[in-house]
């Protein structure tokens, strides 16, 4: 899996159709140029972020391969690779940096807004590798969050199962009442890292209740609100537009982690980025 940047934002308005034929020809030419630039940039990104591991992906239990190609499988780093290296391509770095918001009022972020290291994580509540990350790695990062070194910002990439978008909508609904991370913990605690959980409105309401969401009627309404649905759709489309196709995927300051990695690998990456930021 690789990240590839979208076409330059200045090309966003090229979809308008001028009345004059000469203007239409110019528009078509610019679109062709934009597409060629996007292809070249995508090749650069693929080269920059291609995983260095040479082993075949392993499943959560070493005996079962997740069925979805959109999940980023565990790949053992090379013997020399104990952390994710910093990206070097300026264009890729610009994309990575633009994904960080540092919004103090973001209900789906935890950690100080001015923390030296920000991890932007693209995840899916039905992804077994995301479940492994939530169960095994995130608890090992608690001291870094509480100590002010690390901030985590969540992004939805809801695509593993047909009910992944509904679960993502439920996450937003929980966040509207200040209980996103409690909901996140409840969902992943109940998930089996060997499988792909399917969700219903009722099962998500039950999880919201476990997470302490105070107004469950509002939770259900927000979960099904068209604004929430559109937010999840747009988040997934945005991830795809910058080339993120699988989960989990993490941007950690100037580095990127493609797929599940053990806690030591993630902590080493954070430590290196913190030192670089100091």
Language-model features and meaning:
Residues 99-117:
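A short beta-strand-turn-helix
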Residues 115, 123-125, 131-209:
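Structural alpha/beta surface segment adjacent to cysteine/selenocysteine redox centers
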Residues 2-68, 75-77, 209-278:
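C-terminal cap of thioredoxin/glutaredoxin-like
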Residues 109-110, 199, 223, 257:
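Short clusters of hydrophobic/aromatic residues that line enzyme substrate/ligand-binding pockets
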Residues 121-124, 244:
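Processing junctions and N-termini across compartments
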């Amino acid at each position: 899996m690789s990240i590839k940047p979208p076409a330059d934002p200045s090309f966003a308005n090229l979809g308008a159709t001028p009345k004059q034929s000469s203007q239409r020809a110019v528009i078509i030419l610019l679109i062709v140029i934009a597409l060629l630039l996007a292809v070249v940039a995508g090749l650069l990104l693929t080269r920059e972020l291609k995983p260095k591991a040479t082993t075949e992906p392993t499943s959560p239990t070493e005996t079962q391969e997740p069925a979805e190609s959109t999940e980023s499988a565990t790949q053992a780093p090379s013997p020399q690779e104990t952390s994710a290296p910093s990206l070097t391509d300026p264009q890729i770095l610009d994309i990575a940096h633009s994904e960080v918001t540092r919004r103090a009022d973001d209900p789906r972020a935890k950690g100080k807004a001015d923390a030296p290291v920000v991890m932007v994580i693209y995840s899916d509540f039905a992804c077994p590798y995301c479940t492994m990350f939530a169960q095994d790695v995130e608890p090992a990062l608690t001291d870094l969050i509480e100590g002010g070194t690390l901030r985590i910002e969540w992004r939805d990439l809801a695509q593993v199962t047909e009910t992944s978008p509904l679960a993502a909508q439920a996450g937003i609904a929980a966040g509207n009442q200040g209980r996103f991370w409690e909901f996140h913990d409840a969902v992943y605690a109940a998930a089996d890292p060997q499988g792909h959980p399917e969700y219903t409105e009722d099962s998500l309401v039950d999880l919201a209740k476990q997470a302490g969401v105070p107004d469950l009627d509002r939770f259900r309404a927000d979960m099904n609100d068209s604004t929430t649905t559109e937010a999840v759709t747009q988040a997934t489309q945005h991830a795809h537009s910058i080339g993120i196709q699988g989960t989990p995927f993490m941007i950690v300051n100037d580095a990127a982690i493609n797929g599940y990695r053990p806690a030591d690998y993630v902590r080493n990456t954070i430590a290196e980025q913190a030192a670089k930021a100091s």
